[in-house]
Amino acid sequence: EMCIRDRAIELGLDVVKFFPAEQSGGLAKIKAMAAPYVNMKFMPTGGVNAKNLTSYLDFPKIIACGGSWMVPGDLINAGEWDKIEQLTREAVQTMLGFELAHVGVNAENEEEAVKAANRFAFIFGMPAKVGNSSVFAGSALEVMKTPYLGKNGHIAVKTNYIERAVNYLSTVLGVEFNEESAKRDAKGNLKAIYLKEEIGGFAVHLVQK
């Protein structure tokens, strides 16, 4: 086992397939192997399915997962490509886990933002929290202190893996992103980014869960 990984490094590989993943100890085994090999990433296959997919992908050393649950043999033999496509799309959606995070409202100034957020918070029994550039009412409504992106405001969509979401939306669906809007943490990890387009007068941004 150690020799195989050392051999992979000697060959200049920094990504290796781990198969059969579940039968070989699953995520715990990968974490144990990853500890001494800081630059090695893994692609587990074998026993990976819709239920355990995100538990694997949550580990930063997992670059991708594979699984035959998306392409069952009986559907291949029957030529039911539409069903295979559906299963694959469902796997992608399970991975990305898109959900509404909050709605953003543009206010003219801080006073108006506080007033609007406080009123919303009062009516619906939510806490109001003043931030640097906006005021939140609970987690559902964000009122901007100055007009920002979006004619009508913005809609935030949260995702399990924002980097993977950006890659999927841009390469597969052709969605364009406003790179200047990207926000990153101290380690350089992407935390939020806006789409270039507005939808229904709303700017849209992704946010990391």
For every predicted segment, state its role.
Residues 85, 129-131, 135, 139-145, ...:
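Vicinal oxygen chelate
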Residues 11, 59-60:
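Structural motif
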Residues 16, 56, 91:
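Conserved, mostly hydrophobic/aromatic
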Residues 74-96:
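C-terminal helical cap(s) of enzyme catalytic domains, especially alpha/beta-barrels
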